[in-house]
Structures are given as structure tokens and as C-alpha cells.
Amino acid sequence: MGKAVLKYIFAFCSLLLFISCGKISSDSTNDEVDYSDSKCWFEANQEGMNKKVDIFYVVPTCIWDYTDSLGQIQHNMDIFNTKQRQMVGPSIRLAKNVLSDSCNFFSPYYRQISMDSWLSLDTALIEKRFQLAYKDVVAAFRYYWNNYNQGRPFILAGHSQGAKAVIELLKHEITPEIYQHLVASYAIGYTITQEELDSYPYLRMAKDSTDVGVIIGFNSVTKPEAISPLFKNNIVCINPLNWKTDASPGVSYQGFTASIAPSIHTIVVTGIDEDKYYIPSVEVLLP
């Protein structure tokens, strides 16, 4: 199981160095989300669960602020809106295509906060709006654990906002019983501080590819000065190309090189065409 899972997660992590989502506009809802409803999952038909390992994947930020049918600006996704689902879909499908050959794949729709919320750089505002998103992720994970898992080992994975949700699950929702089944947690594109590592026992940094029950996390830039202010206190970083936590370079089959800059705990990627990965809408996040 280990080599097969690592093979696909290696490819997934490499892809997550660069992916992002697009812009939409549609209505929202403030009702409770019932995760026994198959419509609340990307794919709810789990009759073919024939893998020995599960993965619970939390999608990254894919929506922007939008105006609902009452003319009010909304900052959280309407998970039943078709257009918004279409914007979330590519990111979920990317993860599923990479990981479902080796894992039973579970990914809930949740009321994620908008990209506009992140662009505000207002951490208090972000935390306030994220509470609804996290409430949904908790409800989805509890339903998954009580109804789908059936005692199998599982992996937590999330990118960007999804990584934040994974980190919060590890801090507040994972019990000793659940932790016994946890293979690893992939929290890509977010931040974990030293204070958090010191305060929460299930926030354990991965040191190499053989660790279990740990967090695999990293952020990547092409220049050290491009690191987002939101990640300035991050302490967790492992290179997915060589599973090293030092500055040893890892070389991708795609031709680029990735090395950790120890002073900022961030991967610096060289040998790529920056224009292919530039996202104008998030320019404000850069210094």
C-alpha cells in the first residue's frame, strides 16, 4: 500500500505546486448541510469501495464574492448552485484522477469562503467567515467517519483553504481512536506556526517519506520575496520531490528544480516559465 499511495500522492503534490481556480457569481444558502444527502458530496456512490485506504479531500478556494437573489453580497459558497459547482469541479476531479487509483475518494461540497475574503489580508475577517466553511467540513468528516470509513486507514488532504480545514481537523476533531487510522495529512499551500506545533499533538511535521501520522505541507514560489504575508510565520515545509526538509534540491521529471529556503520554510522553484503560472487576481497577496 505505501509505495502505491506515495506514487500517486507524489504526482498530486507536484501538480499542487501550481493549480488554482476561477471566478463565478451565483446565490448562496445559510441552511444546515446534511451530509447524508448524496448531493452534498462530489460523488456519493461508494458501492465500489474496493481500495484498502481512503482519502478525505477538501477542495481549495474556487469562488469569489457574489450577489444572491436578494441583492446581498455573499462570501461563502452556495453548494447547491450549479455554476459554483462547475468552478469547484475541476479541482476535485484533478485530485480524484490522481488519487482514486489507490484510494477510495471522498470529497464534500462545503461553504468555502471567497477569494475576495483571502485578498483582504484581514486575518480576523478571514477567520470569522471561515467558521461556516469549517462547520461544514467537520459535519462532512463526521459523516464520513461514522458511515463510510468502516475501519480503514485514511489520508486527510487539502490545498489552500482546504489545507486550513485539514489543519483545523487535526487540531480539534481528530481523536486518539481516529488518529490510529490516520496514514498522513497533506496540507498544501497554507501555514502552520511553531506555536501550533507546540500546542497540538497531532500536528507533527513529516521528516521523510516513511513517516506516518504526520503532516506533509509546503508552499512554493519562484523567488523568496514572493512569499505571501499570510504565510510569513509558517514553519512546516517538506520537499515533495525528494522528501527532504533541508535545502537539498529535488528535480522533477518536468524539468524544474525545487529547493527549500530554510529561512522562510518555503520551496523555491526554478526552471519554469513563470508566466504560465501567474495569477493576476491574487497579485495583492504578494509583497
Which residue ranges define each predicted feature?
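Sec-dependent signal peptide recognition
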Residues: V5-F12
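Active-site catalytic motif of lipid deacylating hydrolases and related acyltransferases
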Residues: V58-R152
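A structural signal for short, well-ordered beta-strand segments and their strand-loop junctions
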Residues: I55-Y57, F105-Y109, L156, A184-A187, ...
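C-terminal motif of bacterial Sec signal peptides marking the signal peptidase cleavage site
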Residues: I19-S20
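Surface cap/lid and interfacial helix-loop subdomains adjacent to catalytic sites
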Residues: A133-Q150, K171-P287
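Gly/Ala-rich beta-loop-alpha elbow adjacent to hydrolase catalytic centers
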Residues: G158-G162, V166
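N-terminal module-boundary/linker segments of secreted carbohydrate-active enzymes
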Residues: I24-D54
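Loop/turn elements at helix/coil->beta-strand transitions in domains of secreted/extracellular proteins
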Residues: K51-V53, D101-F105, Q150-P153, Q180-A184
